[in-house]
Design a protein with these regions (language model features):
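His/Asp/Glu-enriched, well-ordered alpha-helical/loop segment
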Residues: 248-255, 301-372, 388
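Metal-coordinating catalytic core of metallo-dependent amide/deamination hydrolases
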Residues: 139-266, 271
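A conserved active-site cap/scaffold subdomain adjacent to cofactor or substrate pockets
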Residues: 271, 277-309, 314-315
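Alpha-helical scaffold segments that flank or form the walls of functional sites
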Residues: 82-148, 172-185, 423-432
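Divalent metal-coordination and catalytic microenvironments
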Residues: 23, 62, 73, 125, ...
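Active-site microenvironment of metallo-dependent hydrolases
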Residues: 2-35, 40-42, 46, 50, ...
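Active-site gating loops and adjacent loop-to-helix segments of metal-dependent hydrolytic enzymes
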Residues: 80-112, 151-172, 227-257, 279-282, ...
Length: 433
């Protein structure tokens, strides 16, 4: 299922077909081709004969064209928390460094953090985020101005929601009103339901969130089996592991109806993998965050693949990664899977790139004059490997045919202003902390 594919009505530049000449293109499956290509606003690509009507012709001599990156688990506003609470395990980190300061959150702070997150995403080639954070409507309006795509899964756990009274049910009602609002949604934004986890949400909240998602055909988003402690505690309390427990509540929203995103899936049994596969759930691998917070393990990609589970990649939030660079996350995913399974054949460049770009309809270009991309060989056989494991600067980002970044400069926001605004806001946010 594709998410957030609406046309962007606030375009800063004309959208349409662009010709890019004398360039390299990474095709579906990971092969590299050189030539002249047409990038169409519907996300398709074709060879150019040179006589087509286009809105722009780009000299691609030092460019590599690829699909854009897709980030399937984020907390974008947590750019505000980047660099705080270092050296703490997950639960201590949440309870001492994150939850206490989030009580101070305001819509304005979330707007500033989200705008900074969008700037980082665009600059590193990501055009889609599946997000779970507070002030969901504000997040949507902010992201719409930048031109990126997103599915925003507002948290419905009243006790942890700074913008609603604990226990009031207002968070659930707010998300229902956002999803059912008949007026046009901002930009390329969709809404979903965020049920944080089995250790934060009680059975009633999990059931209500699932019921609302099913009633509205919306995406469900949850953290599952992120740490050994979470897995052990769930089994001790319910006699079931987290995904088994969720299935016993009829929690999952099947793929054809709206879908379910399960972030982390670190300590998951084969039975649980079969449950995920049966519901068509997206299991999101977040290797950097799992390692940084010493969660006790990361997802087993080979086992997930064997079970038929759809695996995606996510960075998690900027407070636990600390980056939103999904290209770097793709590298981390490949390396940790090889390391954990003692097998250098796992997640080669083609498979890794498929995980990082799965579902993308948009295009980005990378700077081939960047020394990190050299040598790539006259036949281009090293291009994809160099990109994943070495990296390069993002030159252009095209979303739905609209240019949101050109020649290394983002067009839909001013990065210098965004950075200064962020610095000023965190001074207030972390006052006396």
């Amino acid at each position: 299922m594709q998410y957030a594919n609406r046309d962007f009505r606030g375009a800063k530049m004309d959208s349409g077909t662009r010709r890019i000449t004398n360039t390299w293109l990474i095709r579906e499956g990971g092969s590299a081709s050189r030539g002249d290509f047409l990038l169409h606003s519907d996300g398709s690509v074709s060879d150019s004969k040179g006589d087509e009507d286009v809105i722009e012709t780009i000299d691609g001599k030092n460019r590599l064209v690829t699909r854009s990156l897709q980030n399937w688990h984020t907390h974008l506003g947590m750019v505000l928390n980047r660099g705080m609470g270092e050296g703490l395990p997950l639960m201590e980190w949440l309870e001492t460094a994150i939850f206490p300061v989030e009580k101070r959150l305001t819509g304005k702070l979330v707007e500033i953090g989200t705008r900074a997150a969008a700037a980082e995403m665009i600059a590193t080639g990501t055009t889609y985020a599946c997000d779970m954070y507070y002030y969901t409507q504000t997040v949507g309006e902010t992201l719409a101005e930048t031109g990126v795509r997103a599915t925003l899964c507002g948290p419905i756990t009243d006790g942890l929601t700074p913008n609603f009274k604990p226990g009031s049910g207002d968070a659930l009602r707010h998300m229902e009103s956002l999803i059912n609002d008949p007026s046009p949604r901002p930009g390329r934004i969709d809404y979903g339901i965020g049920t944080h986890s089995v250790y934060v949400c009680d059975e009633e909240i999990l059931r209500k969130g699932s019921e609302l998602a099913k009633k509205t055909g919306s995406l469900l988003h949850i953290h599952t089996s992120e740490t050994r402690k979470e897995v052990a505690d769930c089994h001790a309390k319910h006699g079931m592991y987290p995904i088994e427990y969720l299935d016993s509540l009829d929690y999952f929203q099947d793929a054809e109806s709206g879908g379910t995103v399960c972030a982390h899936c670190g300590g998951v049994t084969k039975k649980e993998m079969r449950i995920l596969a049966g519901h068509g759930a997206h299991a999101v691998h977040c290797p950097t965050s799992n390692q940084k917070l010493a969660c006790g393990g990361t997802m087993s990609y080979p086992a997930m693949k064997e079970a038929g589970v759809d695996v995606r990649l996510g960075t998690d939030g900027s407070a636990s990664n600390n980056s939103l660079d999904l290209r770097a996350e793709a590298k981390a995913a490949s390396l940790v899977q090889r390391h954990d399974h003692w097998d250098a054949r796992i997640l080669g460049p083609e498979q890794t790139w498929d995980l990082a770009t799965k579902g993308s309809q948009d295009w980005i270009t990378w700077d081939l004059s960047d020394i990190r991309m050299r040598p790539f060989g006259r036949d281009g056989r090293r291009l994809l490997s160099n990109l994943i494991y070495s990296g390069a600067k993002v030159l252009d980002v095209f979303v739905g045919g609209e240019a949101v970044r050109r020649d290394g400069r983002t067009l839909t926001l001013d990065e210098d202003v965004v950075a200064e605004e962020l610095e000023e806001s965190v001074t207030e946010y972390y006052q006396d902390v």
